[in-house]
């Protein structure tokens, strides 16, 4: 029996579906430029740049003002609240700069994590209060999609059933609110790479978490064709003594997704989870070469793995703008190829792109 309660109209569904498909068009992924002020401070510290608003604006201006060819491999950019209202050097609001290239504008809407009592330092994510009003305003201000990150971890007994259920429910509630306000929700249940667990343990946890997430999305009547998933790849823990090949990581990842993610989801945009730039690209490429049916687009939603070499090239100096943009475009193009399984590593990746970007208990 169909329910007679308020739900999305056919027009709303079509708009959401069209937005999601634009973001993950063939060869395209997402630039996650939604790092908080504190996280940007840590990045700037590494290159001895002061964490002030003008420097943050300056770096993001360099990324966003890259020539229009960037739109061939970047379909969407996730903004931080501050960035949404900043302007480029020539006086245009950043969302306008990005939209003129044909790139979809997104916004991070969660308010960070809070501890779950009675668990082993597990968390839920805050920010549901007032979310509908914020989403309505963001839609008016040019956003067409949103992102919300939940964090889970693998250790003895973790993730707890409570943490899985709570985070799945929070993600579903967020997704429902976004869709009612015309925003495509990116659903991000990240399992942190902290720990010494092996590939199989991560695959098992990933399957349990994703199964719970899609059950919750169904319970909340979320329109799956108008959503995107941003999961972790299935990788061994950062301290795992055993090494696994990109093909093993890819097979475990695709197997977990095939068991849990409905085919109606248009795209799965992986987070990089502290992998080096090159590693994140190689793994994405291998995932798109797995000899199994993959009904969704499998692409990237990278922050560190798209920006690390660019930051190193910039060093806070205006004179380095062209070099920074060149490094950024090169990395974005590599990931665009990887999202089609067409990246052929030359074996001569520079040192910056091979450096691990791992941070324990990573806070975005």
From Swiss-Prot:
Keywords from the UniProt entry: Cytoplasm, Cytoskeleton, Glycolysis, Lyase, Schiff base
Xref: InterPro entries: Aldolase_I_AS (IPR029768), Aldolase_TIM (IPR013785), FBA_I (IPR000741)
EC numbers, comma separated: 4.1.2.13
Ligand binding (substrate): 56, 147
Subcellular locations according to the entry: Cytoplasm, Cytoskeleton, Microtubule organizing center, Centrosome, Centriolar satellite
GO biological process: glycolytic process
GO MF term set: fructose-bisphosphate aldolase activity
Signal peptide limits: none
Pathway given in the UniProt record: Carbohydrate degradation; glycolysis; D-glyceraldehyde 3-phosphate and glycerone phosphate from D-glucose: step 4/4
One cellular-component annotation, GO: cytoplasm
Catalytic residue list: 188 (proton acceptor), 230 (schiff-base intermediate with dihydroxyacetone-p)
Site feature location: Necessary for preference for fructose 1,6-bisphosphate over fructose 1-phosphate: 364
Gene3D superfamilies in the record: Aldolase class I (3.20.20.70)
UniProt superkingdom: Eukaryota
Catalytic activity: beta-D-fructose 1,6-bisphosphate = D-glyceraldehyde 3-phosphate + dihydroxyacetone phosphate
Entry-linked NCBIfam families: FrucBisAld_I (NF033379)
Subunit structure: Homotetramer.
Family: Belongs to the class I fructose-bisphosphate aldolase family.
Name of the protein: Fructose-bisphosphate aldolase B
Organism in which the protein naturally occurs: Sparus aurata
Recorded name of the encoding gene: aldob
